[in-house]
C-alpha cells in the first residue's frame, strides 16, 4: 500500500464520515489491500475477501462516495482486520 492508499484509508476512518472521498480512490485502496473486485450488472460492484462480501453501487452522479458507502467500506475493513 502506497502513501496515496494510506491517505485514503485514513479518510475512510476519519470522524465525522466524509462525503468527499472519490469513489475511484476507495476502489484502488481496496484492491491494493488485496480485496477482489467483481463487476456485477449495472453499477454494482462486489468486494470479496476471506469469505466476506461487500456489495455496493458506484455513484451515478459525481465521483464522490456517499457517506453511507464510506461507512459500509469502513465496517467491511474492520471486519477483515484492516485499520489505519
Segments (PLM) and residue ranges:
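Basic nucleic-acid-binding interfaces
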Residues: 1-84
Amino acid at each position: 500500500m502506497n502513501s496515496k492508499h494510506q491517505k485514503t484509508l485514513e479518510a475512510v476512518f476519519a470522524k465525522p464520515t466524509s462525503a468527499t472521498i472519490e469513489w475511484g480512490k476507495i476502489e484502488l485502496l481496496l484492491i491494493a489491500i488485496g480485496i477482489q473486485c467483481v463487476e456485477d450488472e449495472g453499477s454494482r460492484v462486489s468486494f470479496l475477501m476471506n469469505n466476506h462480501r461487500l456489495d455496493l453501487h458506484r455513484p451515478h452522479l459525481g465521483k464522490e462516495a456517499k457517506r453511507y458507502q464510506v461507512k459500509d467500506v469502513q465496517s467491511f475493513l474492520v471486519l477483515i482486520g484492516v485499520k489505519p
